[in-house]
Every structure is written in C-alpha cells, then in structure tokens.
Amino acid sequence: MLKRPWHIVAVTDVVASSGWYTTLLEAQQNHPGARVFNQISDSDGTVLLCLHWWGPSGPHGDHDWPSLSQKQKRHAACGVLLWFVVDDFDAAWERAQKMGATIHEVPNTNNGTGMRSFVVQDPDGYFVAVNEIREVAAPNNL
C-alpha cells in the first residue's frame, strides 16, 4: 500500500505563497487561485506541500485546528524546516536568487547529507532547505 505524507503549513496569503513555491521548485498548483487551501505538486502529480490559510476552513468553517488557525500563539517557523530534494540543484539556486528569496544559507555541504543544499525563507518566515538529489549507485551485477 502506498503512503505519502501531505505536509500542510499555514500561510498568510495562499495565492502569493503558491506562486513562491511553484517558482522555487518549478512545480504546479492543484488549485490555482484558491485563497484558503492549495497543493503544490510535482510534474507527476505527487503532492510536495499543502498551503493552508491562517484560519478556520472547511465547507462550514468548522475545521479550526489550532496549529493552522492561531497564528498569534506561535511563530510560523517554530519547529518546522521544509526540506525539498531537487533533480536540478543549480537551476533551483538560480531561481531562488532571481525571485529575490531571503537567503539564509548559500550552497554548501555542511548539512549532514554530504550533498549540496541551500536554505531560504518563504514569505511567511518558514525556512526552506533545497538539497540536490543523491545519485544511487547501480548494484554490481557480476
């Protein structure tokens, strides 16, 4: 059985944050223009991240989870690091610079993976790490 997490973070402006993530990750939106909830997905449809407006949601406004509706009680970035692995690291770094992202760490290999990564902040203050994909060696078929 296939299981995948759908990470949801609360944001101030779903439309603006959707644009920010789709640009950085060269991804697509599942609900373009949505103001309460959107999904950022890869070209194969895999959901990478869900964005939820800071506030209650649902058809009747009864989805009122404190972690998504009480912004005043905690800082958005507290306890969260969004980590993405990309197949074209250099292009992602170039996009981050072109879009004027706040850079927290320039590309380095001091992240515990031995692979290059950089860290930027999104418009809501979340730290976003972008890591190059690790090439897996082919098994020895002797």
Q: Which residues does each PLM region occupy?
A:
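Vicinal oxygen chelate
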Residues: 1-6, 28-84, 91-121, 133-142
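Short Gly/charged-rich anion-binding patches and loops
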Residues: 16-17, 91
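Conserved beta-strand-loop-alpha-helix junction that forms the acyl-donor binding cleft
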Residues: 11-14, 87, 111-112
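Conserved active-site tyrosine of GNAT-family acetyltransferases
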Residues: 17-22, 96, 125
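Ligand-binding pocket scaffold of soluble enzyme catalytic domains
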Residues: 129
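N-terminal amphipathic/basic helix or basic patch
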Residues: 2, 9-16
